[in-house]
């Protein structure tokens, strides 16, 4: 069934549910609620760093949030002298605002949240349908992670095929052609012209691709009833009933392959890679140890409104769904699962 999400920012609302209790009296770090609209989290953090004239490392957050959305999350700011009053007197913040919440003795860092709460308006629906609680999803990474060739660049870096990585980067206009001419075949130097964070994102995109492929192999191997939907890198398989959960590797040089060993090793063989390929001596900061991720993500506190006429799309319907997901899981996968069955 066709649909539209994020037709306007109010259609996609995300709020963090923290896993910490904030002190109301004092602490080494100030905690603020950051509310933003159509802004990247890191853009807001960099803006605050410049405005307050403090190092970027003084500011922390628990997770990045969607750009094309209204989001609410928590940030920490190192509590140096008079900084709280400086923040209170900031003027002219564009598309984001701050509200003081309390204190912590440690900074917020990636992963310091319990869940994310979503309110999503689904638009341009041809008809009213019965929407059932999905209860769980296969914990795929969704299309936002990949674009057209992010994972291809990532694999080229992992394989030390730096020439191909540069060629693929040129397709994304991530490199300066004049500098490429200057450095000619010094591909490692050319790659270092790209921000480190961006290069890491490409490596993570390839790791995410491997994870998705592993999930699909498990569905086939466990003979799980499923249906398929298309996405930017092929197909995703969705289980019709909740299957057994597994702790799966986000493959890196230090990943512990605890379950489904043969499927993991067959996938690595098919991709012609080895775990030690994730050690990148030429650009050490891109090396990736790896981590674990659940095969299944629970959909918590799911609810759905009645269908209404869609004021933005003539002769169409809209509906709002609300739910929570654990950190790192994709709300758009929940939407895919619900509407692919109609």
Model-derived regions: residue spans:
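Extended, charged/glycine-rich binding lobes that contact polyanionic ligands
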Residues: 1-24, 29, 37-40, 51-314, ...
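Ser/Thr-Pro-rich, acidic low-complexity intrinsically disordered regions of eukaryotic RNA-binding
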Residues: 41-47, 331, 335
